[in-house]
Amino acid sequence: KGEIALSLERMTAIEEIDVASRTMTVQSGAILQNVQEAAEEHGFLYPLDLGGRGSATIGGNISTNAGGNRVIRYGMTRDQVLAVEVVLADGTIIPMQGKAIKNNTGYDLKHIFISGEGTLGVVTKAVLRLRALPKSQCCTWVSVPSFDALTRFLGFMDGACEGSLSSFEVMWADYYEFITGATTPHKPPVPYGDPFTVLVETQGMQPEKNQSRFEEILGEALETELITDAVIAKNQAERSALWDIRDDVMQQLQLMPMWSFDVSLGIKDMD
């Protein structure tokens, strides 16, 4: 009652890519995948990524403070946003506050609008931070025997990968068996049986060295029984196949409608 729907779907322009500053200025209706591809064309990475990249908009990402698949390395959406332009309910336009990565002048007002879902104002434009485009991506799907082993495996990978760990996507057994079951197009990368499986990805700059070290690290994890099995992607097609299993969750959940939630828990509060 008394609500309106405001669409920014025609505000799709990528207004500027500043190579020197490593920033991109976009309108809120810009599609995430288009932003990623534009960044890559200039040798950069826009690190926010999620399964709905082909339809998700930057304005939606900002309004919900989307996390995505690479939070463990790059942080949430708010960590990728340097400035926003906002329109208030009375039509007042709050202009963007610059695009410097280091800015300690006064209040950083953008943060009250990021994750605000439009309740305080509508984000119409944003300056995004870009990163160096990785030259290598190593990807594996592993089985983990217990939650204790899972937490230790995370710590082990974070240290052994020396800052290159970009994704650590945990799936409980019931989800894994569902998403790779007979009604889906996906085949299970590792056998069923363990309570957890994990999709692990690293990003680096030295392809041969990174892949070799990645395989060594997984070998150590197997030897110390942090994991029980692992399948390593050998090429982009195999990496995409693994990520498709993770990204297909929303499509498959349409087969069994339910209320979905995006919640965060401390690791010590989980089992």
Feature names for model-found ranges:
Residues 1-271:
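Noncatalytic alpha-helical scaffold of FAD-dependent oxidoreductases
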